Amino acid sequence: MKTGMFTCGHQRLPIEHAFRDASELGYDGIEIWGGRPHAFAPDLKAGGIKQIKALAQTYQMPIIGYTPETNGYPYNMMLGDEHMRRESLDMIKLAIDMAKEMNAGYTLISAAHAGYLTPPNVIWGRLAENLSELCEYAENIGMDLILEPLTPYESNVVCNANDVLHALALVPSPRLFSMVDICAPYVQAEPVMSYFDKLGDKLRHLHIVDSDGASDTHYIPGEGKMPLRELMRDIIDRGYEGYSTVELVTMYMNEPRLYARQALERFRALLPEDER
């Protein structure tokens, strides 16, 4: 199974450390977090994209995806007035451009919290409008867009497989896909494999973590409560051939290399020998 490193955990170090560690530790690809100081889309547009492309070449590390920060700090396409919405969409479009230029496999976004007082019809109307515009843009430049479901601790919009199905039905674009961060279904008592059953070939990517079942905290495999060995067997048996990003975020960023090594070793130990 192909593995990806998420660069978010390296944000207090130069981004070259993330590429170097991904290469030396044996990851198969890298998922670029689009936040400062590493790969914020406007900074890439201003010239930083050259460094990202050079690092990918130097370390022979495929960029499997680009994940701009869209969960509300400061960009959230689901909350705020029209000026805020417009600014968020413009940033995501720029991120799609930068993903294309760095030869990323996809641009990954999420629908962050829409606010406690927003009624469902307004939430879904706004989501449909946003996704329609973004998908049209992605179609025009030839970039796949992945919508990530979040946990209920993070959002009240797209949080489970049925929400994803609703979003895909609202915007039936050939460039729109989804994925599963396995923490999200686990904390909601939703079977992870239901995503495979419901989404079929629209399931494009995986984020692998462990979970305590009661928060959105992302743990290294083996530190939580998930039956990961059994889950990975089912995923492999289902014929999944995409990347699995071991998504360490901010919990381990004091020693990102050490934990990235530990996470990869533990993850591969969960797999049958011919899949490691």
Swiss-Prot record:
Region forming the signal peptide: none
Pfam families per UniProt: AP_endonuc_2
Cofactor(s) the protein needs: a divalent metal cation
Keywords tagged on the record: Isomerase, Metal-binding
Record-linked Gene3D superfamilies: Divalent-metal-dependent TIM barrel enzymes
Xref: InterPro entries: IolE/XylAMocC-like, Xyl_isomerase-like_sf, Xyl_isomerase-like_TIM-brl
Listed name of the protein: Fructoselysine 3-epimerase
